Curated annotation (Swiss-Prot):
Catalytic reactions on record: tRNA(Ala) + L-alanine + ATP = L-alanyl-tRNA(Ala) + AMP + diphosphate
One GO cellular component term noted in the UniProt record for this chain: cytosol
Family label: Belongs to the class-II aminoacyl-tRNA synthetase family.
Cofactor: Zn(2+)
Top-level division of the source organism's lineage: Bacteria
Protein name from the UniProt record: Alanine--tRNA ligase
Protein location: Cytoplasm
Entries under SMART domains matching the protein: tRNA_SAD
Cofactor note as given: Binds 1 zinc ion per subunit.
Amino acid sequence: MKYMGLNDIRESYLSFFEKKEHLRLPSFSLIPKNDKSLLLINAGMAPLKPYFTGLQTPPKTRVTTCQKCIRTGDIENIGKTSRHGTFFEMLGNFSFGDYFKEEVISWAWEYITEVLKFPKDRIYITIYLDDDEAFKIWTEKAGVDPSRIFRFGKEDNFWEHGSGPCGPCSEMHFDRREKPDLIKTREKFIELQDKDEVIEFWNLVFTQFDKDEDGNYNKLKNPNIDTGMGLERIATIMQNTDSIFEIDTIREVLDAVCKICNVKYGENHKNDVSLRIITDHIRSVTFMISDGILPSNEGRGYVLRRLLRRAARHGKTLGIEKTFLCGLCDVVIKNSKGAYKELEEKQDYIKNVIEIEEKRFDETLDSGMEILKNYIDELSLENKKVMSGEKAFRLYDTYGFPVELTQEILEEKGIEIDMNDFHSEMEKQKNRARDAREESNYMGKEIKLIDKLPESVTTKFVGYNSTSTDSKVEVLIKDDEFVSTINEGESGIVVTEETPFYAEMGGQIGDKGIIFGKNGEAKVVDCKNNISGKIIHIVQVVKGSIEKNENVTLEVNYKKRKDICKNHTATHMLQAALKKVVGSHINQSGSYVDNERLRFDFTHFTALTDEEILKVEAMVNDEIMAAYDVKTDIMSVDEAKKTGAMALFDEKYGNRVRVVSVGDFSRELCGGTHVNNSGEIGLFKIISESGVAAGIRRIEAITGKEAVRYTEENDNLIRNIEQELKCSKKDILNKINQYHSELKEKEKEINILKGKLASGFEENILSSVKEVSGVKYVASEVKGISGDTLRELCDKVRNKIDDGMVLLASKDGEKVQFVAMASKNAVKKGVHCGKVIKEVASMCGGNGGGRPDMAQAGGKDGEKLETALKEVGNIMEKLVK
């Protein structure tokens, strides 16, 4: 067994199974497609579920992949051990009703012993208790010594999760001991497994049963094979190391971290944990961003933010003061670009996203850490070991601290978070709630009836050239059951042999319209694809009934379709204009097209200037006025790329693609509907440009009559402003600037008067100074001033009383503003403005806090202000030492 690099192992595995007539598929995106049960792809078979369930037809019955995966279930332990990571690659070979146990076992043995040349006396096999068939193949076909095969129960060697496809599995294990002797008993085998001296490296799943709701195991007509071998795990064996962080490609990343922070790996346990966390997380972060995931406060974007900020925080603990993670991703990309070409194609984009997020975290880290330190000090003073969830949520919501990061920091101090309280706060902000999980079985989410349409059902789209056609009803579904009739007043699903209705896809909404037959009429409220691409019409029967097998006429709402076409073609032209005006780095990140407007999300890191927006808009309108023919051509993907056609990075295209061209101005791969000539769009108007995430901008625009209406409304608004300001259009800005100048002068005069008013309060306030245990304090209401003036007055009074605390309050209707300040000596004696003001504000229905020497707060119930101010003395007595 010779040393083998990680990249070489990957290639040898995939090449081996290509020779066994497997189709090598590229890794699927980390973002699951049509599977809400998963946040991120976490297993090699996960993207292949539709093939295993029969919902989609695989491109070949034999497939092999190396799938990028992410698991974050035990993220808090990542770095503490040297064996686990959040990012990993899973090698797999799969059969969809083709070969079964004999072939997969024989090939697994051949690859391990003849290609990788594992010593046979270090290999052990586990099988399911009564899987005699697998035992026979291992011993008779592969020639494995029966004493090296152990049988285990369902917990270890049977793959199932709820109902659905399942089956026994067989695992291959490697004995890592320096001088291995034959393991003779199951007990000894388990003992060595627990010590990680015997490790599992390949799992062969024989999916031969379908478990029903009653728990019965029914034999599948066409059994499948699902295998998984962790690339990093097999690399540790081939490179004779116990740690994934010692593997060639990963060690190179770790060494780069060491170089940045000038720390040597292996000399200090705490430093080693931080080094491993950064090394692991930058790999996950790089691949996630490459697949289109961006930092956010929900879903997979939250996972990314959590990983990125955890890595950045551990960089600080190693003494790294500058942003550094974007540089590390260069090392990740260098080592992985051979297998994942998209990494190099998007390298600048990935680095920009990382740098922006790291800088944002850097900006809030110091203030957030200061707040957290205050919380920890408060808990220490009160001798408490549990921090409220409300405080943890504030750090999360205001300072971008993932709660797990706060937990990690607090754990070092022996403090916990009240997570029930935290989740309660999270629930209050539903717009930031995590993605809800759906109940799922082994193959993912519960399969809906629309995804179980018989293979004989075909739906042909004929809507590129027509908005009306006659066809036959193939399937009717109502209340998730196949039916023969849908009656007036009922809703359901209609599937026909042919349809002119475009099904929602690629950002374009589904068509609306009507379906009518001899006995009734149905309104089509939406049109979608099921998981296998069959077109389904979601309908409401408004007259009579629609029956299965009857001939019907399908008519798309022509006006809505035409407006959708205008907006879709305009979206293509917008992207082309953005690339020309802003830069070639612009790529589509998302889009939405309906009959009223269009929305286009694209990769860019700063807001567009007014000049850029005007240039883009003018360019699109120039091309509209040029009245180019819009052409569509069908060609191979390679041919399309040679023409310069734009495509989405994460989209999987078939062998033949549809290319839509607007003259020579725009050329894109697209399956949507478009105008025949750019002149049909009429007018294009950008109505907004904004940021939606780090590195993602959004343009919203309108076309045709909507754009004309919008322009007319703006003209009317300008006319009204002219009348109000009594000036012409060209003088509006001058008039507004004049009013601004006058307003500023008035504000200056008001502030001078407020200052004089505040000075008049000083004497009254100073006359009411009291004392607690040698510390002076004053709590007073002042009328008619607020904001900066109130703070300035508080500061003056504090300086006048020399050694003490001042709390001032001002009412505006029922609202109350509080400011408190204390001298250094008063703080040393126990005064804490943040604690004082928090209690006082809470009595007035408000909240707030701050530092020991300065704090601010607000209240909602002004009637209770007098009572609250009287309590300041009692609060001071509790604090002063």
